[in-house]
Amino acid sequence: MRRITPFFPFFVLLVSHFSLAISYPLPPEGSRLVGQPVTIAVPQNNTQPLESFAARYGQGLSNMLEANPGVDVFLPQSGSTLVVPQQLILPDTVREGIVVNVAEMRLYYYPAGTNTVEVLPIGIGQAGRETPRNWVTAVERKQDGPVWVPTANTRREYAKEGKTLPAMVPAGPDNPMGLYAIYIGRLYAIHGTNANFGIGLRVSQGCIRLRNDDIKYLFDHVPVGTRVQIIDRPVKFSVEPDGSRWLEVHEPLSRNRAEFESDKKVPLPVTPVLRTFIKGDDVDTSRVNEVLERRSGMPVNISAGRPGL
């Protein structure tokens, strides 16, 4: 049974009361499962939208929606419970620098010389202006008070909606890039926002958007030259040291406009390695099917004869 608690039972808030960076101790060798699931109670006479709970508990809106199907995004029901997906499987890649998994809309930062990983929710490029995927680059430079220069294509798109964009938006509180930017490669940035929504959504022009406390933390701690890897893995899985098998499935990103506008689920990418993993004799097949269909964004123990979440 999940414990109902209004507190953070296992992680540290890094910047302020509403800071979103969650610090997890790295698991022992051979393990990729970190954290614990938490359930919180929505206060009586609640007046806050789901975004407020997502921000308070270091999640993106998509993470909360996956974990709580059917929840009212504008006003979660007073007295109800919300699952906060604070348990996760670390991406199966090098634990170095920054790793962004666009499918789960999370950024992982492995600070050098520590035994921790900081996990932050992100917003990514909207359909047709995708954030790059399967890309390894580095932090080229950092800018306190970035200037936004919309591309000609961006200005045309805004014009179609009857909006006029200037050739340049100066630094300041009205800048869509927020107050800090970390430039990766030549064309993209990890930056803040001037809005109070959009984290966990596909809303940017292709860059990676963070809440303002989070980008301030990264800006202060991530050195120029840091390795940055962007992956697209809606399915993560792990065999833990005790032999248990865990599967975490997110809703994949749509691959085109038709998929984006369709009511049908986007097909999951099933690699040969994943197929072997879920077909093993020590796996509960019915539970696997449930996890693949449900796509809760949370790790589930799919081992035969073992309890799930």
Swiss-Prot record:
Residues 96-231 form the L,D-TPase catalytic domain. CDD domains: YkuD_like. One of its GO terms (biological process) is regulation of cell shape. Keywords: Cell shape, Cell wall biogenesis/degradation, Glycosyltransferase, Hydrolase, Peptidoglycan synthesis, Periplasm, Signal, Transferase. It is an enzyme of class 2 (transferase). Pathway: Cell wall biogenesis; peptidoglycan biosynthesis. The keyword Heme does not apply. Its EC number is 2.-.-.-. The active site is at H191, C207. InterPro entries: LD-transpeptidase, LD_TPept_cat_dom, Ldt_C, Transpep_catalytic_dom. It is found in: Periplasm. GO terms for cellular component: periplasmic space. Pfam families: Ldt_C, YkuD. Gene3D superfamilies: L,D-transpeptidase catalytic domain-like. PANTHER family: L,D-TRANSPEPTIDASE, L,D-TRANSPEPTIDASE ERFK_SRFK-RELATED. This is Probable L,D-transpeptidase ErfK/SrfK. It comes from Salmonella typhimurium (strain LT2 / SGSC1412 / ATCC 700720).
